[in-house]
């Protein structure tokens, strides 16, 4: 049976969370934290800056923000949801990258434990693993549908007790494809009684899928499930760097004990509070515009002579298309030349992804505004035709 304490590193199990006087006393004459009581050194601060009390350390717990995130996610719960979330299920980080790194540090002993990924996938998993001296194992996604290979994953983790984390990106990056929810449920249930490890589902692009696709509302049912989210994509708030980890209350306690006490700034939380309440309608409008433009852009790209197939799916705010050479074959050489010419000659920056597994000739294109997309399509066709003359 799964036991979270069996995979937490021994030094984390005995960790005493950082506490400060402000945890117990929040009002009055506050002379406990060596802050500058005169205020922020900002010329003529505006009302917002004054209200945020930027000379004070931010709230280390962010309970109001956590509850708003929960309220938002529980509007469209996963169809398998049986239990409500609480603020004890959440840990906030400086972007999802902090959450990725924190999970590695929480459960993987450097030089001993391993992490399993399913390429093609997000590159930060491997970077964080390497930094933490954690061995990387791989089970590729199936092709051409970019779904998880359940038998291969089960075989891998059951045969190697040192694998402590399985990272899945859903919707995928660079694939743009949602992993079948039932497939992940199958893994969770199959491994719950025979594997001491965590299945981490990174849902950075989840708001571009059908409502109810998120697995975040299932973490109380599956103690071996962790879900990562961000406000960077659908909410258009990449600049505030806010990542959200949903997990069991027990695991969340350890993650919150590990994190730096004031990791979420007052500026970040102020913006996030507005976005996850008053900004929901705006976010949904943005998502609608992006998905509409995504379909238009993809249709036009696929009509071009030297563009092959849509390599990935349509569950994100980007497309991944296959660039062909003049013989009609997928070509990394042509894709790289197109990428470089667009960037240096036309000031249009896309992303070369042809080096990723099963993505030969791949260019990943984020969906911009209608005007940006028109310019992209014009220059993409012209430059690609010139290359293949």
From Swiss-Prot:
Keywords: Amino-acid biosynthesis, Aminotransferase, Histidine biosynthesis, Pyridoxal phosphate, Transferase. Pathway: Amino-acid biosynthesis; L-histidine biosynthesis; L-histidine from 5-phospho-alpha-D-ribose 1-diphosphate: step 7/9. Its cofactor is pyridoxal 5'-phosphate. Belongs to the class-II pyridoxal-phosphate-dependent aminotransferase family. The gene is HIS5. It comes from Candida maltosa (Yeast). GO terms for molecular function: histidinol-phosphate transaminase activity; pyridoxal phosphate binding. This is Histidinol-phosphate aminotransferase. Its EC number is 2.6.1.9. GO terms for biological process: L-histidine biosynthetic process. Pfam families: Aminotran_1_2 (PF00155). It catalyses: L-histidinol phosphate + 2-oxoglutarate = 3-(imidazol-4-yl)-2-oxopropyl phosphate + L-glutamate. The modification N6-(pyridoxal phosphate)lysine is found at residue 233. InterPro entries: Aminotrans_II_pyridoxalP_BS, Aminotransferase_I/II_large, HisP_aminotrans, PyrdxlP-dep_Trfase, PyrdxlP-dep_Trfase_major, PyrdxlP-dep_Trfase_small.
């Amino acid at each position: 049976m799964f036991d979270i304490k069996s995979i937490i590193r021994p030094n984390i199990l005995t960790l005493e969370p950082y506490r400060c006087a402000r945890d117990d006393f929040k009002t009055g004459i506050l002379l406990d934290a060596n802050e500058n009581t005169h205020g922020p050194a900002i010329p003529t601060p505006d009302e917002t800056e004054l209200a945020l009390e930027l000379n004070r350390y931010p709230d280390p717990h962010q309970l109001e923000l956590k509850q708003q995130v929960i309220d938002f996610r529980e509007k469209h719960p996963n169809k398998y949801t049986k239990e409500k979330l609480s603020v004890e299920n959440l840990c906030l980080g400086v972007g999802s990258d902090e959450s990725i790194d924190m999970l590695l540090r929480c459960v993987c002993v450097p030089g001993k434990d391993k992490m399993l990924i399913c390429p093609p996938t997000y590159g930060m998993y491997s970077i964080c693993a390497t930094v933490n001296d954690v061995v990387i194992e791989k089970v590729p996604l199936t092709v051409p549908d970019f779904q998880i290979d359940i038998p291969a994953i089960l075989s891998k983790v059951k045969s190697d007790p040192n694998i402590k984390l399985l990272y899945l990106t859903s919707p995928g990056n660079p694939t743009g494809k949602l992993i079948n929810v039932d497939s992940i449920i199958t893994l969770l249930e199959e491994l719950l009684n025979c594997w001491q490890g965590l299945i981490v589902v990174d849902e950075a692009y989840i708001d571009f899928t059908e409502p109810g696709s998120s697995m975040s509302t299932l973490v109380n049912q599956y103690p071996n499930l962790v879900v990562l989210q961000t406000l960077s994509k659908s909410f258009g708030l990449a600049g505030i760097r806010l990542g959200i980890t949903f997990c069991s209350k027990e695991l969340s306690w350890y993650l919150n004990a590990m994190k730096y006490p004031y990791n979420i700034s007052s500026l970040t939380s102020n913006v996030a509070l507005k976005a996850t309440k008053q900004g929901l309608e705006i976010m949904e409008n943005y998502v609608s515009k992006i998905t509409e433009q995504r379909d238009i852009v993809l249709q036009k790209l696929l009509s071009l002579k030297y563009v092959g197939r849509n390599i990935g799916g349509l569950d994100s705010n980007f497309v991944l298309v296959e660039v062909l050479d003049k013989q009609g074959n997928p070509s990394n050489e042509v894709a790289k030349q197109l990428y470089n010419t667009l960037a240096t000659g036309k000031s249009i920056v896309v992303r070369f992804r042809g080096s990723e597994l099963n993505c030969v000739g791949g260019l990943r294109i984020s969906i911009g505004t209608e005007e940006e997309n028109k310019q992209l399509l014009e220059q993409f066709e012209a430059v690609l035709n010139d290359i293949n003359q």
